[in-house]
Amino acid sequence: MSEKHPGPLVVEGKLTDAERMKHESNYLRGTIAEDLNDGLTGGFKGDNFLLIRFHGMYQQDDRDIRAERAEQKLEPRHAMLLRCRLPGGVITTKQWQAIDKFAGENTIYGSIRLTNRQTFQFHGILKKNVKPVHQMLHSVGLDALATANDMNRNVLCTSNPYESQLHAEAYEWAKKISEHLLPRTRAYAEIWLDQEKVATTDEEPILGQTYLPRKFKTTVVIPPQNDIDLHANDMNFVAIAENGKLVGFNLLVGGGLSIEHGNKKTYARTASEFGYLPLEHTLAVAEAVVTTQRDWGNRTDRKNAKTKYTLERVGVETFKAEVERRAGIKFEPIRPYEFTGRGDRIGWVKGIDDNWHLTLFIENGRILDYPARPLKTGLLEIAKIHKGDFRITANQNLIIAGVPESEKAKIEKIAKESGLMNAVTPQRENSMACVSFPTCPLAMAEAERFLPSFIDNIDNLMAKHGVSDEHIVMRVTGCPNGCGRAMLAEVGLVGKAPGRYNLHLGGNRIGTRIPRMYKENITEPEILASLDELIGRWAKEREAGEGFGDFTVRAGIIRPVLDPARDLWD
């Protein structure tokens, strides 16, 4: 992309305060243990407010009641979000029963939130329940280590229920990569699990004493599905199979979607192809990419610290050569692969192992007992009788995996009675939002609470123009950090202010093109008016099989983003 102007390998200058905090934290301990015993505040103070993120938690408050509490001279109602580490999204039914119980008894909101990074979150954990949640997870073989902040986050893996053998192999690699890149500090075990301090000094051979410059995201993807949205991630291993068996990976590095409104130095970027590697080099290459970013990433500006910016600064070829040097390998040429879609196949799918897999559409990933739709109770009942496992997808849905023919009817009956199999439109199945209000401190506009009624309106437009059986990949994210992955959608809404969004168009169905801003800071009626006209044109003028995003580019409605580091903001 930008080989012409390679910049310095290391950015000199004053380090950010986050770097000071990590350096002084004694390998992520800080004074979290002491802070836990401070009953005067419901939150964590000073550096601990940020340090708990390395332990998988974010401190939040209920923004719906923030002003009211301020008037009463009360501190915000602090509560933690906890995100579990769950490589590939696979969770046993025993683990599910434990998290269901904790959510119901020990969180403010009582829900389990499936995320588009293939794990679950608890929202609304009061300080007194913070230690118990880590102990509960540990008791069933789970943890929340390194699911937030400057680490390698939860490793994603394509949810492919059909090719069971290939999925099993890819999933094992997702787990191995996750384990290999975990921090080695004993802080987590000491603080949450009461394990004794050992005299040995901590060492972080891969992550280093100050960890990574910024968050780092990794995927294992099995074509032709791009359900995990590889271009949103720093490091991607694309599975290459021969005769149904995994033989190696294509490596793509440097994707990422987060931007800042109006800051043209920030941009979303698709990942760059580095080459093919045989399986035996996987962990060495993963480590080499991470340590190169550790050493070369910008620690003087967190808005310029992600791998995508490092690649653009030093040049893709320079970064790739350093990865080869550190891993002691030479990449082979990229092997052919293609993507055909990224949605989940809702309903029953029979695997080549003759087991059945039931993918349930969970709107916004929010599992709760709703009036007439007791989703949470239904899943608990299934977990009690199901012999296989559950798999969370990167589309915030849930797969009941490995159901023998003899158990199918029993599980389907519970699912139907609980509202887990209610029919929804293809459009709703292909729409997604991040959490946003009321819990996310960064939210600028509604997302999860906005999406259901917004999609009602879109469904009406699709029906009006005779395309109800079609879909447009549509996503809403409450702020430009982009958790809702709107910057890889055909239609992406990025929150700007309460009730206002930037409308992006021109991504594609398979998630390989960044959409461009079409209109700025507009309201829902204005968004719907624009889409009414454009969906009408698409319905009439499209070519056979042409998706909405591709149509908007071909028809000249929007210019495609070809080189986002240079042309995203044009």
Curated annotation (Swiss-Prot):
Siroheme binds at C483. Binds 1 siroheme per subunit. It catalyses: hydrogen sulfide + 3 NADP(+) + 3 H2O = sulfite + 3 NADPH + 4 H(+). [4Fe-4S] cluster binds at C434, C440, C479, C483. GO terms for molecular function: 4 iron, 4 sulfur cluster binding; heme binding; metal ion binding; NADP binding; sulfite reductase (NADPH) activity. Its cofactor is siroheme; [4Fe-4S] cluster. InterPro entries: CysI, NiRdtase/SiRdtase_haem-b_fer, Nit/Sulf_reduc_fer-like_dom_sf, NO2/SO3_Rdtase_4Fe4S_dom, NO2/SO3_Rdtase_4Fe4S_prot, NO2/SO3_Rdtase_4Fe4S_sf, NO2/SO3_Rdtase_FeS/sirohaem_BS. GO terms for cellular component: sulfite reductase complex (NADPH). GO terms for biological process: cysteine biosynthetic process; hydrogen sulfide biosynthetic process; sulfate assimilation. Pathway: Sulfur metabolism; hydrogen sulfide biosynthesis; hydrogen sulfide from sulfite (NADPH route): step 1/1. Component of the sulfite reductase complex that catalyzes the 6-electron reduction of sulfite to sulfide. This is one of several activities required for the biosynthesis of L-cysteine from sulfate. Belongs to the nitrite and sulfite reductase 4Fe-4S domain family. Alpha(8)-beta(8). The alpha component is a flavoprotein, the beta component is a hemoprotein. NCBIfam families: CysI, PRK13504.1. This is Sulfite reductase [NADPH] hemoprotein beta-component. It comes from Escherichia coli (strain K12). The gene is cysI.
